[in-house]
Amino acid sequence: MKIGIVATHVPPALGYGGVAVTAGILTRAWASRGHRVTVVASDESIDHRLKPQEVEMGEGNEVRLYRSYGFRRWGFGLGAIPAIYRLCRESDAVYIHGIATWPCTLAGLFCAMLGKRFVVALHGGLMPEHVALIRARKPHKWLYYRLLTFPALRRAVAIHCTSATETAGARAVLGAGCPILQVPNGVEYRHLEAAPAPAGPGLKLCFLGHVQQEKGINGFLRAWLKVRRPEDRLVVAGRSVDAGYFREFQELLEQSGGSVEYRGYLPKAEVNRLLADSHFLVLPSGLEECGGMRENFGNVVAEAMALGRPVLVARGLAWDGVEAAQTGFAFERSEESACTALRRAQQLTPEQWSELSRKARGYVERQLDPVRLGEKVWKVLTAASDFTGKPLREACSHD
């Protein structure tokens, strides 16, 4: 059976977040089981144009890249038209990473036109707040969704969601009968070992991600400044993508008295070192509700837990069950609740923290294995399972 993969960006593309990372993890998991695919994507990366031999999508897979230009964030390039049409025509089934970008739109339309089986991973594209924002403020984009995106999605054999919130958003737009495959993203953990506890006094936290409102870091910093102790430290690592928001972030840095350090973008090896030097990863996405944006999953949470790092996360993502799983603390989307979670973290004994660390790593091994989760998606994509469209409740729902 010939399987095609369409993505806007693929690893090691720099600057495009978790979608490219997730595409690589899933395809490599399939390759480890002997499943071979053909990948079509743009050559876009903010540091250079990718070449097929650079792409990290698994051994034995064919990679076809087209030239991206103009609207490079959306993977625009006229070469996508023949490349994606050819892929859809020659494939028995196609897996599409994302919605509303140039290659993803083409793939959905071509699959529908050719009568091909296809699955679409939303990657946050229909999160409730995101849809509400488009409807209210972006009439041209909303028209694009109505005319092109939604009709194609309704022809998919399954919509791949990673959390209950993402599932609710998809069904709100596409209808209650929309066939949902709810399976979380996996994380590659086998080459990693849980790191020992950080040395030195104080509580050490880290935030990994873009400095933007969707991530909620400024709201979290305001909470942090209210409760931090003299020896506590917070490190922020990630690019700035919003000048106004970044100015506010810099003002908060100045108020921190050196307790907050900004390191900018870090390569993967340095990210892992930062996690190892921290007691907790923080993911406050959605804490600043103005603008209504938040993440659908949060791959960085899984990556942190793979290194034995418990987490502090805002509720409403894929991680509301971290306390039940004893892998961290969850807080409501308010600064007051974030302060409460921070105080709980500050009060932990070394033994209590070590238990959270152990359970975080164990959770990843049991629930977020990319090969096992990838097989669930593969079976639906290839019609090898009796898929009914009822969500498969996996680790993302923590129940």
Write out the residue ranges for each language-model feature.
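Acidic donor-binding loop of glycosyltransferase active sites
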Residues: 157, 276-296, 309
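Glycosyltransferase donor-sugar binding loop
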Residues: 45-46, 187, 208, 233-248, ...
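Short hydrophobic beta-strand element within catalytic cores of glycosyltransferases
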Residues: 301-306, 310-314
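Membrane-proximal helix-turn-helix segments that form the acceptor-binding/catalytic region
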Residues: 85, 109, 113, 126, ...
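Conserved donor-binding/catalytic core segment of Leloir-type glycosyltransferases
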Residues: 160, 198-215, 221-226, 235-237, ...
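Nucleotide-activated donor-binding/catalytic signature segment of Leloir-type glycosyltransferases, i.e.
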Residues: 246-272
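Carbohydrate-associated surface elements
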Residues: 165, 186
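Conserved acidic donor-binding segment of nucleotide-sugar-dependent glycosyltransferases
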Residues: 324-336, 344-350
